[in-house]
Structures are given as structure tokens and as C-alpha cells.
């Protein structure tokens, strides 16, 4: 009798544990970067805040492309096979052409400008499109980039004429080609060797890539993101909307609180990355150039007849979206 009671008690405990395990939800979060990257830290802040809230919710982060390939993350997110992801939204521009506007020259002037842009009707419209794919934004964030010249400084459009140039993104390639550059496409990891062998004379990439790939060893001049910059890429933390809606009110509140903290960190760290890149290039003896407001305006005029024109032609409702983005001061 005692043995039977013990077995029954053990079964009851096992059932309780099992029930508890079911109640404590686990969310899978994927991204492509290392655990030292700012985008991993953003994910980690949200995960840690949710854990500290003690709301029976755990976020398991899969960094370094360990769950999905970078450009293959959006579809699983829309289908609920993946709960959360940090990614450049333009990676999903094939599925939703409107997303290509989040990697477009001259739409974002500086970091404070993007913090206004994400609170504008432009972002509301983008989020409507995401909602149609069962996707929502938890954390907004843009990262900036600059220009590097092998033999000379690049600030305005005239500076790239005749140069073999690598650009970060199709829209930037279109604009640079319109300015007279010859485009050489390659991942940022190949810029160093291309410059070393003379294949490349100029490049456009993110502030962090300029440093992590030690491009200061190849460049004569660096034009970083400063008071104005041409290259900004939207890289948010997204979540499957149905997954979020199915969470308890307490779990949703914990996620939102963590997201608010992460977004403030993201903005600060994005600015810090730009400043850190300048210090690295100065230390290496590379000349530092600045893009003026006149330079920015000149680039934007070229973008209007190249990148912007192509976007509007290829995107349903593209003109409305572009106008909304350009209206944010």
C-alpha cells in the first residue's frame, strides 16, 4: 500500500512539474552576430529583463547564425516557427519591397533623427505592413556607417567619380553609380583584401565593420557618421505577433519594459560605435573627413533620380512611404 501511495505521489509530482513546464513558455530568438555584438546585447537586455520579472517566460537566444541563415529568418518568423529575431529589415525586401526603404541613402541624417523617424507616421505605415505578415516591432534601432577612400577623402558625389567602389546595399549602389562610380559588389569581409590588391578604391559600410575588418590599415581617409551621415540601416528586434498576443498581460508587460530599456541602450551604443571608429582610425594615422550638410543635400539630389526613383517604380505605395520618410525633420 505504501509503495502504491509513493508511486501515486511521485506521479502527481511529475504531473505538477510537467504542468509547470508547460506554463513556463520559452521563446526562441535568432540573430547572425557574435555574442560581443551590440545587437546580441540588445537581445540579451530584453531576455534578462523578462527573466528578472519572474513571469514564467524565458527567451533563449541563438546567436551566430546557429538557428537560421541570416536571410532566411523572416519567413519562419511570419509563420511562428521562430518567435523573435534581430535582423536588418531590408533582408526581407524581397518579400516586402517597402522594407527596402530602411536601407536608403539620405533618409536618415543622424542618430537623433532616426529616433524621431521610428515614432513617425512613416514607421506606423511600415508596422502596418509587418502586421500583415504577423510581425511586430519590439525594439527599434538604426546603425550608421561611413565612407573610406584608398587614395582620397570621400565626402560629396564628385569624390567617387571613376572609382571602383563597394556599397552596402542595392540602393547605395544605384546612387553611387549615378554619381559616376564603378560598382564592385562584395561582402564587407572582403573589402580589406580587395583594397590591398587594388581591386577597390573606395567603400561604404557600417562603422563597426570599418573597425572589425581593420580597414584603417588600407585607407588614406575615413569619413565617419557624424552630425550628418548618408548610410543608416534599420536593424530592429522583431517578434511574431500571434506569439505576443497569446502571452499573458504580465508577460507582455515584461517584454515591453525590457524592449524600452534595450532601445535606449541601442541608441547610445550606436552613437558610441561611430565615435569608437573615429578613435581607431585616428590612432592608425588615417585622415578623418567630415560630410557637410551641403554634401548630404548633393547626395540626396542624386538619390532622388536613382535610388528613390527605382524604389517608387518597384514598390506599391512607394511614393507615399518615401514622402512620409522625407517629411520627418
Language-model-detected regions and their locations in the chain:
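Bacterial N-terminal signal peptides that target proteins for export
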Residues: 1-9
Amino acid at each position: 500500500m505504501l509503495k502504491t501511495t509513493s508511486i501515486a505521489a511521485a506521479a502527481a509530482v511529475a504531473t505538477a512539474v510537467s504542468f509547470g513546464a508547460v506554463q513556463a513558455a520559452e521563446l526562441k530568438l535568432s540573430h547572425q552576430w557574435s555574442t560581443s555584438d551590440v545587437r546580441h546585447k540588445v537581445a540579451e537586455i530584453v531576455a534578462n529583463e523578462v527573466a528578472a520579472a519572474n513571469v514564467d517566460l524565458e527567451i533563449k537566444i541563438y546567436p551566430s547564425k546557429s538557428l537560421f541563415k541570416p536571410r532566411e529568418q523572416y519567413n519562419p518568423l511570419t509563420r511562428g516557427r521562430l518567435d523573435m529575431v534581430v535582423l536588418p529589415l531590408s533582408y526581407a525586401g524581397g518579400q516586402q519591397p517597402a522594407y527596402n526603404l530602411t536601407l536608403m541613402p539620405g533618409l536618415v541624417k543622424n542618430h537623433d533623427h532616426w529616433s524621431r523617424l521610428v515614432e513617425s507616421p512613416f514607421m506606423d505605415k511600415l508596422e502596418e505592413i509587418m502586421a500583415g505578415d504577423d510581425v511586430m516591432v519590439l525594439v527599434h534601432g538604426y546603425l550608421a556607417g561611413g565612407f573610406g577612400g584608398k587614395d582620397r577623402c570621400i565626402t560629396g558625389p564628385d569624390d567617387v567619380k571613376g572609382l571602383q567602389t563597394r556599397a552596402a546595399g542595392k540602393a547605395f549602389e544605384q546612387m553611387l553609380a549615378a554619381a559616376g562610380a564603378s560598382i564592385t559588389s562584395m561582402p564587407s569581409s572582403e573589402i580589406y583584401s580587395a583594397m590591398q590588391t587594388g581591386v577597390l578604391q573606395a567603400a561604404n559600410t557600417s562603422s563597426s565593420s570599418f573597425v572589425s575588418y581593420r580597414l584603417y590599415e588600407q585607407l588614406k581617409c575615413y569619413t565617419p557618421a557624424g552630425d550628418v551621415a548618408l548610410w543608416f540601416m534599420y536593424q530592429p528586434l522583431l517578434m511574431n505577433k500571434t506569439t505576443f498576443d497569446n502571452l499573458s498581460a504580465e508577460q507582455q508587460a515584461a517584454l515591453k519594459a525590457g524592449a524600452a530599456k534595450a532601445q535606449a541602450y541601442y541608441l547610445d551604443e550606436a552613437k558610441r560605435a561611430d565615435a569608437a571608429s573615429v578613435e581607431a582610425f585616428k590612432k592608425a594615422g588615417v585622415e578623418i573627413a567630415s560630410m557637410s550638410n551641403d554634401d548630404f543635400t548633393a547626395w540626396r539630389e542624386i538619390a532622388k533620380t536613382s535610388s528613390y526613383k527605382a524604389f517608387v517604380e518597384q514598390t506599391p505605395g512607394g511614393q507615399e512611404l518615401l514622402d512620409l520618410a522625407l517629411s520627418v525633420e
